[in-house]
Every structure is written in structure tokens, then in C-alpha cells.
């Protein structure tokens, strides 16, 4: 498979997002699908209230346009490609329902945590059944080494934890203009390189499609954002990156490449644990990006800094996965 196919998929998904976004944004405004802003959030965010949300639909559509091109013209519809499409669409649907309820209720509360968890578990179960059907092994490799271990039936628990953890971690990161679109494109770009070097061609192409879709969406999501991706986009991306890590047998690499998402999640865990145990908060606000806003950083400065940190994690992951393995 020639490298030009990666460029073709990248350009196709980027173009799809760039073309569809300006058509979709007025449609969202007409339907009054505006974002509700939490009252307890940073005061500077109140002016964003009403900004069109559910832009993740554009991201998912752009990914699927490219995925269809991959399936029809490049690799065929392999089981791995179909599983990636199912997980991305499934988590995107859960996010869509959540976003829709928020818009209809005019409040930043959509699905309950139990309802969202149930939806995520159903998709995880479907994914696991799909893995069993293709004879997927349960061996875990330690990045950068020749060591590993077989989890056996415990692999099911790992899959559930990865899909739930990644989807929620990515969702937490979507709090500033361009933050998730930028860090996400970096992480998926890294996985595209890792998958390609490991011979997982269809997964590499799918990762590239997501990278292109996010870069195209970033044109309209960068500060000041004209549209937000909402849970439709963030949950789809979280599910996708976990599925990619699993299918490429780079489960532990997700912690490195997705380092920004891990840090954001840890900041929330630390904040909640500290407040419950001591009654004091470690950060001004969590997730971490809000803390930096409240200490005086501009939104754009926070976003660019997180992009740079994401690049460092991505470079580390590619170095370990390609050159040390």
C-alpha cells in the first residue's frame, strides 16, 4: 500500500469537513441548537451561550465519507474497518442523544450518567463480540519492549475500561475553543503513523480520516468558535481512539499518545478526591484547562499550550512505538 493513500484520505476528510461546516452551522442556528453554558463555569464562557453545538455530526459524516472511500477503493470493508465504524457511530449516537436533550431542555443536562453509561456499555459489548468473531487475541504488549502478557477473559474488562475511560476523558477535554479538535488531531495523527508502521493499514487510514476531519472542523472551531462539536463529536472520538489502540494492539500506548486526555481526567479525580477528603480544592477549577483560565491565562494561550503538550506526548508515543519496538 502506497503512502499517497494516507494523503488522499487526509485531504478527503479535511475537505469534507471544511465544505460541510459552513453549510451545517446556519442549519443549527435555524433549529436553535445552541450550547447551554454551565453557570458554575468560568464567567468568560457565558458569552458563548447560544453558539451552535452538535457540530460533531460534521466530524462523524466526514469520517464516514472517508471510511466509505477506504472500503470501496482501497482496502475493502475489512472486519477491523467495520468495527471502527460501528464504535465511532455508536458512541456518536449516544453523544447525539445527550446533545439533543440538552438543546431541547435549554439546560446543560442531557442523559443521566446511568443512561449514558448504559449506551456506552452496549457499544463496548458489540465491539467485544466483534473481536471474538474475528479471533482477536488477548495478549497485551508493553510499549518499547519485547515483553507482554495474556489477560485471558480479563481482556473484556480492559476493553470496557478503555472505551468508557477514553470516551469520557476526551469528553472532559472539550471545554475550550479548538482544544479537543487540536489535541485530537495530534493524537489520531500519531496513531495513524503507529498503525501504518505496524502494518495495520485500514486502521491507519481510519485514523488519518479522523485527523483530517478534525483539522477541517478546527477551521470553524478555533477561537472564537463558530460551532462546538458537542458530545456527538467528543464521545465518538473517545470511542474511536480506544478502538484504534485495541485493534493495533497498542492498548498501553493510549496512555502516552492520549497524555493530554489522561492529565485532564486526573485533574478532575484529584479535585474531587481532595475536596471530599479535606474540604479543599487543589485547582481553581477542573478540568485542568479551566484552572489556567482562572489564574489569568487567555483561552488561546491555554489551548496552544495544551496542543504543544499533546505534540510532545505524540512524539514520545511514535518514538517508542516505531523506533524502540
Curated annotation (Swiss-Prot):
The keyword Translocase does not apply. One of its GO terms (cellular component) is plasma membrane. It catalyses: UDP-N-acetyl-alpha-D-muramoyl-L-alanyl-gamma-D-glutamyl-meso-2,6-diaminopimeloyl-D-alanyl-D-alanine + di-trans,octa-cis-undecaprenyl phosphate = di-trans,octa-cis-undecaprenyl diphospho-N-acetyl-alpha-D-muramoyl-L-alanyl-D-glutamyl-meso-2,6-diaminopimeloyl-D-alanyl-D-alanine + UMP. It is a multi-pass membrane protein. Keywords: Cell cycle, Cell division, Cell membrane, Cell shape, Cell wall biogenesis/degradation, Magnesium, Membrane, Metal-binding, Peptidoglycan synthesis, Transferase, Transmembrane, Transmembrane helix. Its main location: membrane. CDD domains: GT_MraY. Its EC number is 2.7.8.13. Its cofactor is Mg(2+). Pathway: Cell wall biogenesis; peptidoglycan biosynthesis. It is found in: Cell membrane. GO terms for molecular function: metal ion binding; phospho-N-acetylmuramoyl-pentapeptide-transferase activity; UDP-N-acetylmuramoyl-L-alanyl-D-glutamyl-meso-2,6-diaminopimelyl-D-alanyl-D-alanine:undecaprenyl-phosphate transferase activity. PANTHER family: PHOSPHO-N-ACETYLMURAMOYL-PENTAPEPTIDE-TRANSFERASE (PTHR22926), PHOSPHO-N-ACETYLMURAMOYL-PENTAPEPTIDE-TRANSFERASE HOMOLOG (PTHR22926:SF5). HAMAP family: MraY. Catalyzes the initial step of the lipid cycle reactions in the biosynthesis of the cell wall peptidoglycan: transfers peptidoglycan precursor phospho-MurNAc-pentapeptide from UDP-MurNAc-pentapeptide onto the lipid carrier undecaprenyl phosphate, yielding undecaprenyl-pyrophosphoryl-MurNAc-pentapeptide, known as lipid I. NCBIfam families: mraY. Belongs to the glycosyltransferase 4 family. MraY subfamily. This is Phospho-N-acetylmuramoyl-pentapeptide-transferase.
Amino acid at each position: 500500500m502506497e503512502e499517497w493513500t494516507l494523503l488522499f484520505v487526509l485531504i478527503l476528510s479535511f475537505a469534507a469537513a471544511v465544505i460541510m461546516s459552513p453549510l451545517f452551522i446556519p442549519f443549527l442556528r435555524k433549529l436553535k441548537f445552541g450550547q447551554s453554558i454551565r453557570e458554575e463555569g468560568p464567567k468568560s464562557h457565558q458569552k458563548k451561550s447560544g453558539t451552535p453545538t452538535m457540530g460533531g455530526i460534521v466530524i462523524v459524516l466526514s469520517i464516514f465519507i472517508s471510511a466509505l472511500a477506504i472500503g470501496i477503493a482501497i482496502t475493502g470493508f475489512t472486519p477491523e474497518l467495520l468495527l471502527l465504524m460501528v464504535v465511532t457511530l455508536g458512541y456518536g449516537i449516544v453523544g447525539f442523544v445527550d446533545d439533543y436533550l440538552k438543546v431541547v431542555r435549554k439546560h446543560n443536562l442531557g442523559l443521566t450518567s446511568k443512561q449514558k453509561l448504559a449506551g456506552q456499555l452496549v457499544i463496548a459489548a458489540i465491539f467485544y463480540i466483534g473481536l471474538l468473531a474475528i479471533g482477536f487475541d488477548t495478549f497485551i504488549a508493553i510499549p518499547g519492549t519485547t515483553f507482554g502478557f495474556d489477560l485471558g477473559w480479563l481482556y473484556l474488562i480492559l476493553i470496557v475500561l478503555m472505551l468508557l475511560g477514553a470516551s469520557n476523558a476526551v469528553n472532559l477535554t472539550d471545554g475550550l475553543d479548538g482544544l479537543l479538535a487540536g489535541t485530537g488531531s495530534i493524537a489520531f495523527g500519531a496513531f495513524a503513523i503507529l498503525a501504518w508502521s505496524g502494518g495495520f493499514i485500514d486502521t491507519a487510514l481510519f485514523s488519518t480520516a479522523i485527523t483530517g476531519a478534525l483539522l477541517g472542523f478546527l477551521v470553524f472551531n478555533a477561537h472564537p468558535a463558530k460551532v462546538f462539536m458537542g458530545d456527538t463529536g467528543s464521545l465518538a472520538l473517545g470511542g474511536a481512539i480506544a478502538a484504534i489502540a485495541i485493534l493495533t494492539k497498542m492498548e498501553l500506548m493510549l496512555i502516552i499518545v492520549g497524555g493530554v486526555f489522561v492529565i485532564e481526567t486526573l485533574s478532575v479525580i484529584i479535585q474531587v478526591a481532595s475536596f471530599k477528603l479535606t474540604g479543599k480544592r487543589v485547582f481553581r477549577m477542573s478540568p485542568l484547562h479551566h484552572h489556567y483560565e482562572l489564574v489569568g491565562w487567555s483561552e488561546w494561550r491555554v489551548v496552544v499550550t495544551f496542543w504543544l503538550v499533546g505534540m510532545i506526548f505524540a512524539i514520545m508515543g511514535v518514538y517508542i512505538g516505531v523506533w524502540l519496538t
